Amino acid sequence: SSKTEIEIKDFIKELGINLPFICENGSAIYNLDLINKKLPKKVILSKNIKSISRLYREKVPLRIRKKIIDLRKINDVEQIKIFGLPKNKIKLALKRSFTIPIKFNDDIKDKKKFIKIIKDTGLKIQEGGRIMNLGDNVDKSLAMQIFLKNVKTFIKDPIKTIGIGDNHNDIGMLKNTDIPCLVYSESFKGKNIKIKNLIVSDKPSPQGWADVMKKAVLKI
């Protein structure tokens, strides 16, 4: 998930169960030990947020940084509008260990230049609908593969993976799952995505997530 560790922990607490999970776009894996006690409780794949912030300040020219809004530093009203979350959930979304949520406030030419600088620095920009996330060179697909490698050490039965996404930062993951599912989104319709056997919903979230999940389960 692109969500933070604390967001996901809050969600699984509401569900009343404990689960392994991947957070912040593949930055870390938690609770592998629930599958087998010999597996680690935590696997960190990303640089920490302090290191990423330092590289950002050192490598990105001030002229471009002035066009970038750090969404952790704007007022509550703007945060609620941009994230589309209630105030109590915003606090959880901003408690980040590995990524910085940002918005780019200028022309496409400078945005492309910024993304190139970040890539050359060894970091990565992942776009997820309302916001961009600045983080290390990791993603959901890489974390998923590491997760499966660990799990397959102890589970010898065949494993089928279901990937569900609704945005740019989900494409790599969907390409590497057995049953890929794309939820309809106004901001990302994914018309040109070429993924074999892709299940696509007709409706947006939350109904779209339920629809593709039902179809995916029937394919297992």
What are the language-model segments listed below?
Residues 5-9, 111, 141, 170-171:
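Short, well-ordered alpha-helical microsegments
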Residues 11, 79, 172-173:
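Hydrophobic/aromatic ligand-binding patch that stacks against planar heteroaromatic rings
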Residues 15-17, 25, 121, 176-178, ...:
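Short, structured coil segments at secondary-structure junctions
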Residues 18-24, 88-90, 180-185:
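Short hydrophobic/aromatic-enriched beta-strand-loop microsegments
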Residues 63-162:
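Conserved acidic, metal-coordinating active-site core of Asp-based
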Residues 131-220:
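Mg2+-dependent phosphoryl-transfer enzymes with acidic/Ser/Thr/Gly-rich catalytic loops
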